[in-house]
């Protein structure tokens, strides 16, 4: 392992120390919570910073695994228009990533969804079996 790889691994472990990044792939529906910082100038001339969180939910149509620069592309339909947004996986702006449902697809990149709408743009849901526990046996 060279020095650049070691530096990237250390940086990734620092950024993921306080948040969990789930395993997801193309076709999964995710909800990404993003931190937004607004700047406003008050009447006395002082600058005021306000933080808020905004949720963005959509289908992952592409995922790029490149170490610290890993990213994923999420597509959603907003007011009848398709909106795509790329998120850096290890960015401090990304507060949390939650998988809403898992999809079944046969491609790694789902760019063909851009040309589809309605029923033809649907993705089948992958059902994950629940592990048997002691409570289920009793």
UniProtKB/Swiss-Prot annotation:
* Molecular function GO terms recorded: structural constituent of ribosome
Tell me, what does this protein do in biology? This protein is located at the 30S-50S ribosomal subunit interface and may play a role in the structure and function of the aminoacyl-tRNA binding site.
Gene symbol of the encoding locus: rplS
Q: Which GO terms describe its cellular component?
A: cytosolic large ribosomal subunit
Name the protein family. Answer: Belongs to the bacterial ribosomal protein bL19 family.
| Keyword annotations | Ribonucleoprotein, Ribosomal protein
A Pfam match is: Ribosomal_L19
**Species:** Rickettsia rickettsii (strain Sheila Smith)
Tell me, which GO biological process terms does this entry list?
A: translation
HAMAP family according to UniProt? Ribosomal_bL19
PROSITE patterns to which the protein is assigned, alphabetical: RIBOSOMAL_L19 (PS01015)
UniProt cross-references to NCBIfam families, sorted A to Z: rplS_bact
For this entry, the protein name equals Large ribosomal subunit protein bL19
């Amino acid at each position: 392992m060279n020095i650049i790889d070691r530096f990237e691994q250390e940086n990734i472990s620092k950024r993921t120390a306080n948040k969990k990044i789930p395993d997801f792939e193309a076709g999964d529906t995710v909800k990404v919570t993003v931190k937004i910082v607004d700047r406003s100038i008050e009447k006395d001339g002082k600058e005021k910073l306000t933080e808020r969180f905004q949720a963005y939910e959509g289908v992952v149509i592409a995922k790029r695994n490149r170490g610290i620069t890993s990213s994923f592309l999420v597509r959603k339909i907003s007011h009848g228009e398709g909106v795509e947004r790329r998120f850096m996986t290890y960015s401090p702006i990304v507060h949390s990533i939650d998988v809403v449902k898992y999809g079944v697809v046969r491609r790694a990149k789902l760019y063909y969804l851009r040309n589809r709408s309605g029923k033809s743009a649907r993705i089948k849901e992958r059902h994950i079996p629940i592990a048997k526990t002691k409570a289920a046996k009793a």
